[in-house]
């Protein structure tokens, strides 16, 4: 955000979750240094989104818990009341929650440009954002390709540890 307020769509991008998200990019660069395009770029964005939620939860333990919707909204404080992304229900932000499912940005034969978000790095991060939500909170359902799932949530401490250990081995 450029600070001009809601008339431009964003207030300054200075919320806790956005700041943690940006620091998450630094962690990703220092650990696995994924190429910022296509599927690796979407994983990079997902790591950063997950750090945003994890740190926001850590900073506000008395105000929120793992099921609080605000923890799973990214940038709701800077996007004039609506989140930039929804980690709990990515489709509500126009992002996919299933690889190759509804809202998936096709990456095969995609040439990364600024105009296509480097082949959908922000859009396709929704798949792994949903994964992180599920391993943290748990949930069940049927995804876009017909696979049934039932996940027992681990909570933020264990989910965050899995997240970081994954970054270390990629």
Q: Locations of the language-model features?
A:
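Zinc-dependent metallohydrolase catalytic domains
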Residues: 1-20, 28-170
